[in-house]
C-alpha cells in the first residue's frame, strides 16, 4: 500500500516540500536561516494576534493599552517582549540569510532572489509600522520623519505625504491605518514565502561549493529536519534569554514617554535594524538624494545577479572576493553604529565614507575582483 503522505492531495505537497525533498548533502548551518525565518514569522503572527486582542489604535489610548497589556493581561509582558524582540531576531536571521545568498552565489536563482527582495521590503514595511503602534515619543517622531521623506518626490510629494497621514500631521488617522496594515502585511509576507519556496523547489537548493549537486542528494527528512530543529532550539533559547533577562536592551528609552507633538527627542532614530539605511540617508545633504540612496541601499540587491562576473558561483574558492565580502560586512556594522550617533563631527564624515564604500564595493570592486580572479584561474 502506498503511503498516505504520497497520495493525499494536501499531504503530497507537504511531503514533496519537507519530507522527500532531495537536498544537497553538503549544506552547512548557513542554510538553517530559511527555516528559522519561518519560525520567526510564526512567532510574530501568533504573538501579534494576541496583542491585537488588547491593543487599541487610538492616539488617546494606544500608549495606555500597551501599558495595560504589560501590567494587567496574563503574561501580556511576555507577549509584548516576545513580539518586540522577535522582530530583532527576525532581522538578524534575515540579514544572515541575505548574506549567505551573497557569499555562496544563491542570487543566480533570479526568481527566488527577486521574491526574497520583495519579502525583505514587505518585512521592513511591517516592522516600521509596528514601531509606530506603541505611540511613544520615538514612535511618533520616527513616523513623522520617515513618512516626511516622501515629500522629496517632485511635484506629488507633499500631497502624497498628507494622503498617507490622513491629515496635516501624524495623528489618529495615521495610527489607525498603520495598525490595519501592520495586521495585514504579515499574511502577505506568508503568501510571498510560499512563492519564494515554490521558485526554490523549481531549481533545488544551492550548496556551499556552488557546484551542481544532482548526483549527490539526500532526503530532507530526517537529515535536515533534525538540523533545523537544533537551529530552532538555539534561536528560541537566545530569544527567551533576551526576553526574560534584558527585554529593553534593543529598544529606545524614549518610547516609554507618551508621544508629544510639541517636544522633539534630542536624537530621532529608528530601530537598530534600520540604522545602516538611516546612516546612508543622513550622509547625503540633499533630501531627494538621501531618499534615493536609502531605497537603493536595499534595491541594489536586485542588480547583484547582473554584476556577477566570476566563472565560479560561490566565494568558497575565491579568497580575494571573500576579503571584499567581509569588508562589506564591516562597512555595514560601521553604518549601523553611525546611524545611532548624533549628526556631528566626526560621525558625519565617517558615515559619508562608509556610504561611498558600501556602494563602491557592490557596484565596482566586486565585479572587478571577480574579473581579476578569472584571469588568475587561467594562469
Swiss-Prot record:
<dbReference type="InterPro" id="IPR030689">
    <property type="entry name" value="Cytochrome_b"/>
</dbReference>
<keyword id="KW-0496">Mitochondrion</keyword>
<dbReference type="InterPro" id="IPR048260">
    <property type="entry name" value="Cytochrome_b_C_euk/bac"/>
</dbReference>
<feature type="binding site" description="axial binding residue">
    <location>
        <position position="83"/>
    </location>
    <ligand>
        <name>heme b b562</name>
    </ligand>
</feature>
<feature type="binding site" description="axial binding residue">
    <location>
        <position position="182"/>
    </location>
    <ligand>
        <name>heme b b562</name>
    </ligand>
</feature>
<feature type="binding site" description="axial binding residue">
    <location>
        <position position="196"/>
    </location>
    <ligand>
        <name>heme b b566</name>
    </ligand>
</feature>
<keyword id="KW-0999">Mitochondrion inner membrane</keyword>
<feature type="transmembrane region" description="Helical">
    <location>
        <begin position="178"/>
        <end position="198"/>
    </location>
</feature>
<feature type="transmembrane region" description="Helical">
    <location>
        <begin position="288"/>
        <end position="308"/>
    </location>
</feature>
<keyword id="KW-0830">Ubiquinone</keyword>
<comment type="function">
    <text>Component of the ubiquinol-cytochrome c reductase complex (complex III or cytochrome b-c1 complex) that is part of the mitochondrial respiratory chain. The b-c1 complex mediates electron transfer from ubiquinol to cytochrome c. Contributes to the generation of a proton gradient across the mitochondrial membrane that is then used for ATP synthesis.</text>
</comment>
<keyword id="KW-0479">Metal-binding</keyword>
<feature type="transmembrane region" description="Helical">
    <location>
        <begin position="33"/>
        <end position="53"/>
    </location>
</feature>
<dbReference type="InterPro" id="IPR005797">
    <property type="entry name" value="Cyt_b/b6_N"/>
</dbReference>
<dbReference type="Pfam" id="PF00033">
    <property type="entry name" value="Cytochrome_B"/>
</dbReference>
<dbReference type="GO" id="GO:0005743">
    <property type="term" value="C:mitochondrial inner membrane"/>
</dbReference>
<dbReference type="GO" id="GO:0006122">
    <property type="term" value="P:mitochondrial electron transport, ubiquinol to cytochrome c"/>
</dbReference>
<dbReference type="InterPro" id="IPR036150">
    <property type="entry name" value="Cyt_b/b6_C_sf"/>
</dbReference>
<protein>
    <recommendedName>
        <fullName>Cytochrome b</fullName>
    </recommendedName>
</protein>
<dbReference type="GO" id="GO:0045275">
    <property type="term" value="C:respiratory chain complex III"/>
</dbReference>
<feature type="transmembrane region" description="Helical">
    <location>
        <begin position="320"/>
        <end position="340"/>
    </location>
</feature>
<keyword id="KW-0349">Heme</keyword>
<dbReference type="InterPro" id="IPR048259">
    <property type="entry name" value="Cytochrome_b_N_euk/bac"/>
</dbReference>
<keyword id="KW-1133">Transmembrane helix</keyword>
<keyword id="KW-0472">Membrane</keyword>
<keyword id="KW-0813">Transport</keyword>
<dbReference type="GO" id="GO:0046872">
    <property type="term" value="F:metal ion binding"/>
</dbReference>
<comment type="similarity">
    <text>Belongs to the cytochrome b family.</text>
</comment>
<dbReference type="Pfam" id="PF00032">
    <property type="entry name" value="Cytochrom_B_C"/>
</dbReference>
<feature type="binding site">
    <location>
        <position position="201"/>
    </location>
    <ligand>
        <name>a ubiquinone</name>
    </ligand>
</feature>
<keyword id="KW-0679">Respiratory chain</keyword>
<dbReference type="GO" id="GO:0008121">
    <property type="term" value="F:ubiquinol-cytochrome-c reductase activity"/>
</dbReference>
<feature type="binding site" description="axial binding residue">
    <location>
        <position position="97"/>
    </location>
    <ligand>
        <name>heme b b566</name>
    </ligand>
</feature>
<comment type="subunit">
    <text>The cytochrome bc1 complex contains 11 subunits: 3 respiratory subunits (MT-CYB, CYC1 and UQCRFS1), 2 core proteins (UQCRC1 and UQCRC2) and 6 low-molecular weight proteins (UQCRH/QCR6, UQCRB/QCR7, UQCRQ/QCR8, UQCR10/QCR9, UQCR11/QCR10 and a cleavage product of UQCRFS1). This cytochrome bc1 complex then forms a dimer.</text>
</comment>
<keyword id="KW-0812">Transmembrane</keyword>
<dbReference type="InterPro" id="IPR027387">
    <property type="entry name" value="Cytb/b6-like_sf"/>
</dbReference>
<dbReference type="InterPro" id="IPR016174">
    <property type="entry name" value="Di-haem_cyt_TM"/>
</dbReference>
<feature type="transmembrane region" description="Helical">
    <location>
        <begin position="347"/>
        <end position="367"/>
    </location>
</feature>
<keyword id="KW-0408">Iron</keyword>
<feature type="transmembrane region" description="Helical">
    <location>
        <begin position="113"/>
        <end position="133"/>
    </location>
</feature>
<dbReference type="InterPro" id="IPR005798">
    <property type="entry name" value="Cyt_b/b6_C"/>
</dbReference>
<feature type="transmembrane region" description="Helical">
    <location>
        <begin position="77"/>
        <end position="98"/>
    </location>
</feature>
Amino acid at each position: 500500500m502506498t503511503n498516505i503522505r504520497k497520495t493525499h492531495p494536501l499531504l503530497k505537497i507537504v511531503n514533496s516540500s519537507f519530507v522527500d525533498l532531495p537536498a544537497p548533502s553538503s549544506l552547512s548551518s548557513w542554510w538553517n536561516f530559511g527555516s528559522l525565518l519561518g519560525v520567526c514569522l510564526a512567532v510574530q503572527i501568533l504573538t501579534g494576534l494576541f496583542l491585537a486582542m488588547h491593543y487599541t489604535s487610538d492616539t488617546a489610548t494606544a500608549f495606555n493599552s500597551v501599558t495595560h497589556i504589560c501590567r494587567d493581561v496574563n503574561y501580556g509582558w511576555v507577549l509584548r517582549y516576545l513580539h518586540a524582540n522577535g522582530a530583532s531576531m527576525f532581522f538578524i536571521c534575515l540579514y544572515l540569510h541575505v548574506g549567505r545568498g551573497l557569499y555562496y552565489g544563491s542570487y543566480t536563482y533570479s526568481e527566488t532572489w527577486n521574491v526574497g527582495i520583495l519579502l525583505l521590503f514587505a518585512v521592513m514595511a511591517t516592522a516600521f509600522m509596528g514601531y509606530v503602534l506603541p505611540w511613544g515619543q520615538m514612535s511618533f517622531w520616527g513616523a513623522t520623519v520617515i513618512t516626511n521623506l516622501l515629500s522629496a518626490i517632485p511635484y506629488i510629494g507633499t500631497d502624497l505625504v498628507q494622503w498617507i497621514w490622513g491629515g496635516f500631521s501624524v495623528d489618529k488617522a495615521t495610527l489607525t491605518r498603520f495598525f490595519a496594515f501592520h495586521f495585514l502585511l504579515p499574511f502577505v509576507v506568508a503568501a510571498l514565502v510560499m512563492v519564494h519556496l515554490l521558485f526554490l523547489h523549481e531549481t533545488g537548493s544551492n550548496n556551499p561549493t556552488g557546484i551542481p549537486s544532482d548526483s549527490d542528494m539526500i532526503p530532507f527528512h530526517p537529515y535536515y529536519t533534525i538540523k533545523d530543529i537544533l537551529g530552532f532550539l538555539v534561536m528560541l533559547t537566545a530569544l527567551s534569554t533576551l526576553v526574560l533577562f534584558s527585554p529593553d536592551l534593543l529598544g529606545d528609552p524614549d518610547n516609554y514617554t507618551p508621544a508629544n507633538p510639541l517636544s522633539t527627542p534630542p536624537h530621532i532614530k529608528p530601530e537598530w535594524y534600520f540604522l545602516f539605511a538611516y546612516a546612508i540617508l543622513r550622509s547625503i545633504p540633499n533630501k531627494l538624494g538621501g531618499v534615493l540612496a536609502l531605497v537603493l541601499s536595499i534595491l541594489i540587491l536586485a542588480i547583484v545577479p547582473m554584476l556577477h562576473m566570476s566563472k565560479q558561483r560561490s566565494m568558497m574558492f575565491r579568497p580575494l572576493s571573500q576579503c571584499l565580502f567581509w569588508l562589506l560586512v564591516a562597512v555595514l556594522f560601521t553604518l549601523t553604529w553611525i546611524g545611532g550617533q548624533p549628526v556631528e563631527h566626526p560621525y558625519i564624515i565617517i558615515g559619508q565614507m562608509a556610504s561611498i564604500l558600501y556602494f563602491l564595493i557592490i557596484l565596482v570592486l566586486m565585479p572587478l575582483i571577480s574579473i581579476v580572479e578569472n584571469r588568475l584561474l587561467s594562469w
